[in-house]
Amino acid sequence: MANDKLNISPLERAIDRLSEGWDRYQSDTSDAQILDGLIQRFEFTYEISHKLLKRHLEANSANPAEYDEMSFQDLIRSGNEQNLLLGTWTDWKRYRNMRSKTSHTYDENIANEVVSGIPEFLTETRHLLVQIKKRLA
């Protein structure tokens, strides 16, 4: 896969939507519908971000197939080694756990836990996007 064919627009849009949701939530933290939408936006931004990370690593590897067999933990470590990520494996494990919790049950405490991690996650995904854009330039 050529790096110039890497489509970053889904991540750009997802980050914009998550940021917009965060701003709306901040203006009214009591609105359950806004909270639900914010969590959903977190979920799809998380999915897009780690998939784009993998595609970028594959596109710049002499052996792209190695990333198909790589664990999520090693994928994050590879992203760190290439300065694509701010967070460590521990941070991304927390994001992954947040995503997992939201997809299996709905609980107000879990929702609040997920929401509390969104600002840090937004910083992380924005950094990933900037780093990939630099490499595409």
PLM features: residue spans?
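Solvent-exposed interaction patches of small proteins and small membrane subunits
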Residues: 1-137
